[in-house]
Each structure stands twice: as structure tokens, then as C-alpha cells.
Amino acid sequence: MKKFTQVTGVVAPIDRANVDTDMIIPKQFLKSIKRSGFGPNLFDELRYLDEGQPDADCSKRPINPDFVLNQPRYQGASIMLARRNFGCGSSREHAPWALDDYGFRAVIAPSFADIFFNNCFKNGLLPIVLEEKEVDKLFEETLATEGYQLTVDLERKKVVKPDGTELSFEVDEFRQHCLLKGLDEIGVTLEDRDAIGAYEERRKAEAPWMFLGVQ
């Protein structure tokens, strides 16, 4: 998993509440269990004028020029600004996969659906909850300023505006540690490999019968 320490990037505003996971990555793209390759189909039904199909060449599809991600001012965005209840709907880990594959490192919103929120942390994507009035102000500033950028400092738990204003956010200490170190669940376990190895050796001495036939 990629480390997340500090990210500065262009902000892309998705100005609608209750964006569900089917909107983020439609159901026809869920057959793959690889974590990569979903970026071109992120927000597929909003981003293109035709119906998306798996394995279609997205570079040849007609785009919706009014959609945020197709507008030149938001190209290369790495921070998404969203409204309340982002990521609601059915549980699909493909949703954070698609956001990550597109290039987003953080999503800022007043609230998130619980399962989506948890899946983000497992895939190196930082979901940031700010007060609704703070999000409203960020939308106002993002829409008014072309190339509007924010800095997300995970270590300090701050969102920093271009004028230096800092907005604080909360994040669980364990999840913060995992993102800062780039650790998924397996990586966290391997941090204790020495202790695990020592325990196994001790158990082999105490109860050798448990390890009969174990290579």
C-alpha cells in the first residue's frame, strides 16, 4: 500500500449529496478482482455519454463535457471534495480502488457511508470528515479559483488552504499509523514477525506434538 504523509494537489468538486458506490464504479465493472485498471471507469455514467462496457477503449468514447473530471481546470486532481453521505449504497471495495487508480489520495466530505469509509483506509485512500460549513466554504473557493489546491498533512491532521488557513480533522491513531507507514493488514502483522517467530519456537518446545507434519 502506498504511504500517505502529505499531499498537495488540485481539488475536484463533486457537488451532490448521497453519491453511491454504483455511481462511483458501476456494477458491470466489478468482475475483476485486480485493484488496478478502474480509473478510466470512475463515475462512468456521469463521465461518458454512452453506456460503459468492460474492456471498452475509454479513449474512444464520447465524453460529457459538463462533468467535473472532464474539465481542463480539474485535470490531475488528487483531492476530491464531496457532499454528505459519500460512498453510500452497496458494499464494493472497487469504489476506493477506482478513486485510487484515477489518482485521488484523499476525499473530503461532511460524512461518509461506514463501509466505504473503512474500505478507504484499507486501500491507502484518506477519507476526511470536516464540518459542513467548512466543506461549503471549500466548494465556494474551489469553484471560484481555477487550479485551486489544498495540502493534506496526515501527520498533523490538518487540511491547509492556499492562504495558510488550517482545518483540523480527526483520524484513528492506528489508521493514521498504517497510512503513514503504507501498511495494509498483512503489513501490520509483519511488523511483529519477530515476536510471532519467537512465540512459534516457544510453542514448539512446549507442545511439539502440535507441529507434527508441519514443515
UniProtKB/Swiss-Prot annotation:
One of its GO terms (cellular component) is 3-isopropylmalate dehydratase complex. GO terms for molecular function: 3-isopropylmalate dehydratase activity. HAMAP family: LeuD_type1 (MF_01031). GO terms for biological process: L-leucine biosynthetic process. The keyword Amino-acid biosynthesis applies. This is 3-isopropylmalate dehydratase small subunit. Belongs to the LeuD family. LeuD type 1 subfamily. Keywords: Amino-acid biosynthesis, Branched-chain amino acid biosynthesis, Leucine biosynthesis, Lyase. CDD domains: IPMI_Swivel. The gene is leuD. Its EC number is 4.2.1.33. It comes from the Bacteria.
